[in-house]
């Protein structure tokens, strides 16, 4: 969702609460429970869940490996669920032409630096950069180059949904709003 007026441009970012992350967290959790239950069933010598027959599986080495995969999958699944719960990566970009200030805010992982808040003067913005990498894994990333600070990504690196036309359009609109040049690399 974006909001624009003559002097202010606010762009909200979704973060990790995406449909794909929910899907993979559920699949990983259920698959890990299946692996772990088969490993435990092979250790006990009886079926815990009737759908997953495991009496033919020896505990050593198959049951041990299944248990290990189940535990590892539960750890990865819990990491995904925590990023979804904390909404890591969400935030906003606010460009205020009237005040001459750019504010970038992102939520991170819990801790001292949970809130990432960057603030710049508009006159320090040198350019808007577009990085385009085509091939098997295409990447189109929009950056803002700040004098003395380097480059700051404005779009997420996993946003593969931008077509070349969309990223060019977004860069052109932002460069026009900020009155800075566009660079492509």
UniProtKB/Swiss-Prot annotation:
Bilayer topology term: Multi-pass membrane protein
Membrane-spanning residues: 21-43, 63-85
Principal location listed in the UniProt entry: plastid
Pfam family for this entry, one: Ycf4
Keywords assigned by UniProt, alphabetized: Chloroplast, Membrane, Photosynthesis, Plastid, Thylakoid, Transmembrane, Transmembrane helix
Location in or out of the cell: Plastid, Chloroplast thylakoid membrane
GO biological process, one term: photosynthesis
GO cellular component terms, A-Z: chloroplast thylakoid membrane; photosystem I
Disulfide bonds: none
InterPro entries: PSI_Ycf4_assembly (IPR003359)
Coiled-coil stretches: none
Family statement: Belongs to the Ycf4 family.
Purpose of the protein: Seems to be required for the assembly of the photosystem I complex.
Protein name: Photosystem I assembly protein Ycf4
Organism taxonomic ancestry: Eukaryota, Viridiplantae, Streptophyta, Embryophyta, Tracheophyta
